[in-house]
Amino acid sequence: MSAKDKKLGEVVRELRERQGLTQPQLAERAQLALSYITLLESGQQVNLSPSAIGRLARALGITSKQLSEIGA
């Protein structure tokens, strides 16, 4: 696991928890598989397509650009 994967996962978890969302709720809002959210938050390397970045960002209340910069 790379440092950027871990950082992205930590930020996603923090944003999700601030909004009082569970992983299943975030997965549903972002229209992503729960396993994808779980892997992401645990710092595993996942391939974020532009579409997935957009859906995840909207579900977390941030822009796609902000989310992309976290994972850069």
Describe each PLM feature range.
Residues 39-42, 72:
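Short, conserved catalytic or interaction motifs in soluble domains
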Residues 11, 36-39, 66:
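Residue-level recognition of specific faces of alpha-helices
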Residues 66-72:
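Short amphipathic recognition helices of helix-turn-helix/homeodomain-type DNA-binding modules
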Residues 51-66:
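DNA major-groove recognition helix of helix-turn-helix/homeodomain DNA-binding modules
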Residues 17, 28, 58:
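Alpha-helical residues within the helix-turn-helix
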Residues 1-18:
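A short, Lys/Arg-rich alpha-helix, primarily the initiator
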Residues 20-39:
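Short alpha-helical DNA-recognition segment
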